[in-house]
């Protein structure tokens, strides 16, 4: 080929590249014209968001149904209270109201549908059902005795859950082993049974290597008594075993991964869990295929004609659903981060011809039992978005014993005052200030950087560096403090002396704190920051009474000022002063 001859290969590649760019631009304009929003989790709405959402929903329903709908009134004022009730009485009334409205706290149901429905009709029915569900929760929020935690408010996220529940034979609810009941949603299990009575719900207790063996035994007994299908599992340990690595975290229990004789308390490995999931799902498939008469009445008939079992993973954000699937598949197929809400759409992964896994995005279910700060400390809500860090740190301080915090971080927390309960947990301010002082975290203002310290402590709490776990209902909590000796506090307040006959002669010389000492401690109490520094204040040295008088001020000489005379003009006068002539020293001749 000569130099004068030209080819069109390069020009064709450039045209193809420009064509692909133009197609991507047109595709973006198409989605923009459809006003298609990015799928993300929404747990809280502001005033303007609620107004816009209310207007959009009302306009859609009016356009479709040609009738005015009841406006969505969302009460965003959560601080209003019409009466002042004692704290204990208010808690009792709150428990009664929660038990009374427990049945109203449901997962939104998908309305019935058929393949003959159009896309617009199905979309309108789902939005109407979701709007009715939101109104029901708003009516619960209007009750002053009920505190509803943040929950998922994005309809598209709930649609992902509906699809996973419909196509799954075995539904695996992933929970955190340190508090399984906090992450369990009983109404989700009831909804799965409403879709198909032959569907099974399995509780996958993840992060089980953070629990001692005796605690796992108690939880296994609780699950058996309540007829709950459960399996203990550790996604991090399974991934490390698959990659041939050794866990470096000292806070994880290495002895827990050893095989035990009891299959209920053992921590399953990758192959064992796959076999268990396939066995449970195949049992459901056999029952499903035997119902030939009822197949025609189902709207998803195509799913019933297959022999492949589908296992769906559902649960709260950041409990380890995607990590579990990656460990079961054997490679990273789903995104995993410490920030909740990484998974946006449900994904199907084929393990074999007989088993398929389905990963669902994490959802925050509505509940009464927890607070917003407890959800942040549990990793359900993002840590980086919190605005009040002391409340979330107080949750950590209440659940982790004082000696454990001091041992893990190698710090010394301030001791309680004499008038306080000696077994009380440390305050959030005490923990944050001690942590910042030991690490040298200082903000630009010169004060301790409590925000940075709070984020690091919360991440250690979620990751397991700060060991904590809850016990089953009806059993004493771990590291429960002893009952406070109230008689000792009464003796301190009354200034009474200790019992000489019981203690002996040695106690006669000991100083028993009296009412003056208690008042001195009360004077060091700061309402804004909890407690002041524990430095000893030295008393001022008293002087003699005859030396306490104030000396009169020395009178200054102001004779140079002009007196108020008739000839005076108010200006200072200049006195004529003639310096004597210096004739020098006298010389003797």
UniProtKB/Swiss-Prot annotation:
CDD domains: HSR1_MMR1 (cd01857). SUPFAM superfamilies: P-loop containing nucleoside triphosphate hydrolases. Disruption phenotype: No effect on the association with 60S pre-ribosomes, but altered rRNA processing and accumulation of 18S rRNA precursors. Embryo and leaf developmental defects. Severe delay in development of the first true rosette leaves and frequent fused or triple cotyledons. Lsg1-1 and lsg1-2 double mutants are lethal, when homozygous. It holds the Pfam family MMR_HSR1. Residues 341-345 are annotated as: G2. GO terms for cellular component: cytosol; nucleolus; nucleus. Residues 158-366 form the CP-type G domain. It is found in: Cytoplasm; Nucleus. Residues 534-558 have a biased composition (Basic residues). Residues 495-509 have a biased composition (Acidic residues). Residues 580-589 have a biased composition (Polar residues). The keyword Cytoplasm applies. GO terms for biological process: cotyledon development; leaf development; positive regulation of ribosome biogenesis; regulation of auxin polar transport; ribosome biogenesis; rRNA processing. InterPro entries: G_CP_dom, GNL1-like, GTP-bd, GTP-bd_ortho_bundle_sf, P-loop_NTPase. Keywords: Cytoplasm, GTP-binding, Hydrolase, Nucleotide-binding, Nucleus. Belongs to the TRAFAC class YlqF/YawG GTPase family. GTPase involved in ribosome biogenesis. Binds to 23S rRNA and associates with 60S pre-ribosomes. Involved in early cotyledon and leaf development. PANTHER family: LARGE SUBUNIT GTPASE 1 HOMOLOG, LARGE SUBUNIT GTPASE 1 HOMOLOG-RELATED. In contrast to other GTP-binding proteins, this family is characterized by a circular permutation of the GTPase motifs described by a G4-G1-G3 pattern. This is GTPase LSG1-2. It comes from Arabidopsis thaliana (Mouse-ear cress).
């Amino acid at each position: 080929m000569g130099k004068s001859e030209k080819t069109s290969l390069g020009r064709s590649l450039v045209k193809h590249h420009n064509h692909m760019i133009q197609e991507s631009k047109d595709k973006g304009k198409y989605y923009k014209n459809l006003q298609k929003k990015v799928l993300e989790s929404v747990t809280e709405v502001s005033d303007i968001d609620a107004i816009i959402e209310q207007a959009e929903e009302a306009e859609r329903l009016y356009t479709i149904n040609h009738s005015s709908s009841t406006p969505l009134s969302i009460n965003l004022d959560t601080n209003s209270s019409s009466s002042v009730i004692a704290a204990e009485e208010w808690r009792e009334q709150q428990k009664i109201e929660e038990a009374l409205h427990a049945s109203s706290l449901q997962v939104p149901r998908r309305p019935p549908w058929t393949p003959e429905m159009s896309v617009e009709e199905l979309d309108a029915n789902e939005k109407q059902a979701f709007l009715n569900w939101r109104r029901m929760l708003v009516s619960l929020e209007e009750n002053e005795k009920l505190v509803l935690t943040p929950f998922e408010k994005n309809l598209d996220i709930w649609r992902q859950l509906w699809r996973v529940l419909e196509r799954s034979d075995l539904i695996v609810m992933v929970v955190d082993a340190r508090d399984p009941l906090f992450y369990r949603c009983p109404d989700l299990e009831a909804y799965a049974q409403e879709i198909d009575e032959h569907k099974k719900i399995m509780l996958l207790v993840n992060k089980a290597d953070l629990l001692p063996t005796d605690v796992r035994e108690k939880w296994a007994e609780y699950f058996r008594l309540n007829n709950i299908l459960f399996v203990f599992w550790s996604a991090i340990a399974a991934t490390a075993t698959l990659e041939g690595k050794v866990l470096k975290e000292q806070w994880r229990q290495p002895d827990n991964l050893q095989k035990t004789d009891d299959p209920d308390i053992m921590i399953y490995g990758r192959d064992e869990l796959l076999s268990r999931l396939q066995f449970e799902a195949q049992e459901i498939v056999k029952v499903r295929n035997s119902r030939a008469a009822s197949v025609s009445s189902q709207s998803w008939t195509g799913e019933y004609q297959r022999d492949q079992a589908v296992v769906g993973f559902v649960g709260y954000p950041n409990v380890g659903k995607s990590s579990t699937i990656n460990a079961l598949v054997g490679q990273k197929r789903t995104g995993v981060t410490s920030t909740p809400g990484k998974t946006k759409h449900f994904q199907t992964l084929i393990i074999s011809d007989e088993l398929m896994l389905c990963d669902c995005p994490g959802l925050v279910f509505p509940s009464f039992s927890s607070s917003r700060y407890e959800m942040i400390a549990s990793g359900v809500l993002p840590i980086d978005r919190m605005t009040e860090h002391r409340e979330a740190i107080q949750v950590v301080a209440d659940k982790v014993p004082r000696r454990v915090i001091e041992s893990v971080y190698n710090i010394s927390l301030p001791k309680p005052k004499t008038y306080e309960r000696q077994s009380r947990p440390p305050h959030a301010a005490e923990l944050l200030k001690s942590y910042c002082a030991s690490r040298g975290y200082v903000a630009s203002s010169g004060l301790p950087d409590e925000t940075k310290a709070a984020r690091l402590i919360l991440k250690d709490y979620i990751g397991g560096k700060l060991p904590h776990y809850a016990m089953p209902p009806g059993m004493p909590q771990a590291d429960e403090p002893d009952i406070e000796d109230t008689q000792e506090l009464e003796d301190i307040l009354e200034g009474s002396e200790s019992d000489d006959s019981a203690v002996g002669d040695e106690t006669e010389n000991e100083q028993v704190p009296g009412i003056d000492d208690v008042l001195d401690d009360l004077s060091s109490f700061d309402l804004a920051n909890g407690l002041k520094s524990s430095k000893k204040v030295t008393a001022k040295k008293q002087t003699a009474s005859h030396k306490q008088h104030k000396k009169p001020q020395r009178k200054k000489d102001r004779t140079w000022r002009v007196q108020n005379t008739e000839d005076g003009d108010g200006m200072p006068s200049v006195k004529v002063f003639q310096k004597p002539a210096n004739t020098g020293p006298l010389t003797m001749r």
